[in-house]
Regions:
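A short, highly charged nucleic-acid-interacting micro-segment common to nuclease
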Residues: 2-13, 104
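Post-HExxH zinc-binding segment in Zn-dependent metallohydrolases
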Residues: 99-132
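Short alpha-helix boundary/capping elements
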Residues: 85, 89-90, 118
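Hydrophobic beta-strand residues in large extracellular and virion-surface proteins
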Residues: 32, 59-61, 81-82
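Active-site scaffold of zinc-dependent metalloenzymes
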Residues: 38-73, 88-92, 102, 106-113
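Auxiliary, metal-adjacent structural segments of Zn-dependent hydrolase domains
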Residues: 8-55, 121-130
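Basic nucleic-acid-binding interfaces
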Residues: 96
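Short alpha-helix carrying the canonical HExxH Zn2+-binding catalytic motif
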Residues: 73-86
């Protein structure tokens, strides 16, 4: 019988780690997907590190660097994941500001929650090895 090698790719490893982090942050039903870019990001343009869909419970993360398409460090991916999970914990709301309605997506309470999530991830005995 031939032995099959079970290689763990960077994407599979990231999905497993992110699913564990979601359980740690009490959002086990979030679906994690990997963003696949068709071409590298050009110089001087903004680019997306990840995005979330609140209705579908979906988080999409970019696990490769923008230009050279090399695998990112797990700690950087976990920081983006903490930010995206916070969008589910502190959803955006509408606010009347200077005579018009605005949608507050990123606000001080939001960023406090992001920092709390990152601290929880860093305190975990399994995930703290990626921040060393």
């Amino acid at each position: 019988m031939s032995e099959q090698k079970c290689e763990i790719t960077h994407e599979n490893e990231v999905i497993k780690i992110c699913n564990y982090a979601c359980q740690l942050l009490r959002y086990p039903k979030l679906n994690i997907e990997i963003m696949h870019r068709l071409k590298p990001v050009t110089k001087g343009r903004g680019y997306v590190l990840g995005y979330t869909n609140l209705k579908k419970n979906l988080v999409v993360l970019d696990v490769y660097t923008a230009r050279l398409r090399k695998p990112k460090k797990i700690s950087a991916i976990l920081n983006v994941l903490a930010h995206e999970i916070t969008h589910h914990q502190r959803p955006p709301y509408r606010q009347w500001h200077r005579g018009r309605w605005i949608i507050r997506q990123h606000y001080p309470r939001f960023y406090k929650q992001v920092n709390k999530n990152i601290v929880k991830i860093k305190k975990d005995k399994i995930l703290k090895q990626y921040f060393a």
